[in-house]
Amino acid sequence: MKLRDSLAENNSIRLQAEANTWQEAVKIGVDLLVAADVVEPRYYQAILDGVEQFGPYFVIAPGLAMPHGRPEEGVKKTGFSLVTLKKPLEFNHEDNDPVDILITMAAVDANTNQEVGIMQIVNLFEDEANFDRLRACRTAQEVLDLIDRTNAAA
């Protein structure tokens, strides 16, 4: 499942969302996937449990978090959601706080999780200007167009 197709088919983009805590921000992304029948509601708790155990493991770049759990933690099918925050939040990551872009990922198997999802997101942000371009997006279509332009350039 491609990042762009998943976001479009699942209607799983939320821009300029308001959250007061990192937990609320993660829940927004998971709730989009629950609504699209990609994950079960328990996926949210699995992500929180992962942070409790390993720290903010999914904050992968300055301003960018990629919340995800394991396939057996409530994943029904592979999919993504994308959330931008109106106000950046602290995720307690030493180097990459504050975060205002979250791409929540669910994958039915670990290989899909690592290879497909992470590579597509790396591709999107290889051009660092895309962080600010994404922050400037105000509609889901603008996000999809940005991904299309990035893929065309790759």
Curated annotation (Swiss-Prot):
Chain positions with Phosphohistidine modification: H68
Species: Salmonella paratyphi A (strain ATCC 9150 / SARB42)
Source superkingdom: Bacteria
Active site (record annotation): H68 (tele-phosphohistidine intermediate)
GO annotation terms (biological process): phosphoenolpyruvate-dependent sugar phosphotransferase system
A single GO cellular-component term on record: cytoplasm
SUPFAM superfamilies found in the cross-reference section: Phoshotransferase/anion transport protein
Gene3D superfamilies per record: Mannitol-specific EII, Chain A (3.40.930.10)
Pfam families found in the cross-reference section: PTS_EIIA_2
Name by which UniProt lists this protein: Ascorbate-specific PTS system EIIA component
NCBIfam families: PRK10372.1
Keyword check for RNA-binding: no
Swiss-Prot/TrEMBL induction comment: Induced by L-ascorbate. Repressed by UlaR.
Record remark on domains: The PTS EIIA type-2 domain is phosphorylated by phospho-HPr on a histidyl residue. Then, it transfers the phosphoryl group to the PTS EIIB type-2 domain.
